[in-house]
Amino acid sequence: MNHELALHVIEQALQYGIKEFCVAPGARNAAFVYLLAQIPTIKVYYWSEERSAAFFAVGRIKATHQPIAVVTTSGTAVAELLPATIEAYYTSLPLLLITADRPRRFRLSGAPQSIEQVGIFSCYTILEKDLAENEFFQLDQWSGRGPCHLNVCFEEPSKNDNQECARSFSMGIFTPKPILCDSHLLDEFIQKCQFPLVIVGALNQNETTPILSFLRHLKAPVYLEAQSGLRENSLLENLRIESVEDVWNCSSQHGYPIDGILRIGGIPTARLWRDLEETNNVKVCSISENPFAGLTNGNIIHTSLREFFKNYRLSFKPIYSFQAWKDANRSYQLELLKLFEEEPLAELSLFHLLSKKIPEESKIYVGNSLPIREWDQAADWTNKHFQVFANRGANGIEGQLSTFLGLASPEQNNWAILGDLTTLYDMIAPWVIHQIQPLKVNVVVVNNSGGQIFAPKFAHLSFLNSHQLNFKAFADFWGWEYDCWHEIPTTILGSQTSRLIELVPDPSATDRLRKKMQRM
């Protein structure tokens, strides 16, 4: 009985186009484990811990642009999937959650490994099915624009779960459901705003060309976050605003009082985005693959970015005069570069120098909290064709190393830049690395002795989670190469295997740099 039910679920997943499964084996999902092991056309990653398995799947989705499944046993194993499910929900990723469950008669009984799994993910799945013996469904009901939960009720595991499966399986092709929209909200925004600023957040690689063309035709000032893939593009240099520190005052003082924000792509990391909650006279229009405005106000055009900008034509061509602001902005950047030279051991300076030394065409994953902000602020402007990624759906620090390993590519140098607390959150992540093709992996752990993002805001020391730990033992535990840097070496060679680099900023230099920047 269990075998037939498992067979139906896996057939649906394969027909949908799923070719990779992250499996945390247990007694209740044994029928899935045995069945998946017999299918030669798929890749199965085996995990001992479900939370990291799910974040690894998030990384695989980002790398392949294909749906990935996570398969768990029953009980609290299912609850471990919630953080990654939330991340996938807010970034519209096709994450399939296949959770084994005890039979329905055990619900609300408190029996061992019986929790209420139906509805456990609340609003964070866009489709949920609860299945038992002789119950069938079609997975093509799933739009693929967010997580799906299949809860599968099995009887007690038995020898019959390990049946040989002689059937051949047909593999489908993943085709997400199209999003239909019109462009009148963008037309209206362009017509009403005299002083717009465009902010480009996270984009997929196939979206950058039509968006680049749109930006060059619009000719409005644009702030490009690293995840856009356009940050260092020389074709946008004449439009590029490189710093948004004190952006409202600086733009107004130089004759360009911002009256509109056009957001393209993911929700921005920059502080100016949060400022919009308290800025009532600024119109906001967002164009995104994700259906979230990212604010309590503003319009959202939920659409396929590639198709939208391939077909969009400006109804008229406005003229924006922002050269004075751009010149002042560039002067600020030059002053900042001088400060990096004055304080080369400060944390922000180390980010700048690291960005100059990482090999061209590397794939870079930037962790949440300080690293993503410091990369956007300090990375060099030379176009080295980096691909920059992050988990910015819910901005959490869990699962970052697992996501990076899922994202990593055998054909590229792969770099993760993570905070110390972020790394401690995900120490099981390297479990999977021997199951992946040989990778060139460099994990930079910025060890600033705790959560320094809170240092300027909160006086109570408990916010910092201060520590005196180092990460050599972590590297040794997993058999990784280890380096400790207090400054950036003149030459950096990408590792040919797996390497952990502990980057230790000078706290006094970091504090001096922060104070100098406040006086700029």
From Swiss-Prot:
Its cofactor is Mg(2+); Mn(2+); thiamine diphosphate. The keyword Nucleotide-binding does not apply. It is an enzyme of class 2 (transferase). GO terms for molecular function: 2-succinyl-5-enolpyruvyl-6-hydroxy-3-cyclohexene-1-carboxylic-acid synthase activity; magnesium ion binding; manganese ion binding; thiamine pyrophosphate binding. GO terms for biological process: menaquinone biosynthetic process. SUPFAM superfamilies: Thiamin diphosphate-binding fold (THDP-binding) (SSF52518). Its EC number is 2.2.1.9. It catalyses: isochorismate + 2-oxoglutarate + H(+) = 5-enolpyruvoyl-6-hydroxy-2-succinyl-cyclohex-3-ene-1-carboxylate + CO2. Binds 1 thiamine pyrophosphate per subunit. It comes from the Bacteria. InterPro entries: MenaQ_synth_MenD, THDP-binding, Thiamin_PyroP_enz_TPP-bd_dom. Keywords: Magnesium, Manganese, Menaquinone biosynthesis, Metal-binding, Thiamine pyrophosphate, Transferase. Pathway: Quinol/quinone metabolism; 1,4-dihydroxy-2-naphthoate biosynthesis; 1,4-dihydroxy-2-naphthoate from chorismate: step 2/7; Quinol/quinone metabolism; menaquinone biosynthesis. Catalyzes the thiamine diphosphate-dependent decarboxylation of 2-oxoglutarate and the subsequent addition of the resulting succinic semialdehyde-thiamine pyrophosphate anion to isochorismate to yield 2-succinyl-5-enolpyruvyl-6-hydroxy-3-cyclohexene-1-carboxylate (SEPHCHC). Belongs to the TPP enzyme family. MenD subfamily. Homodimer. HAMAP family: MenD. This is 2-succinyl-5-enolpyruvyl-6-hydroxy-3-cyclohexene-1-carboxylate synthase. It comes from Protochlamydia amoebophila (strain UWE25).
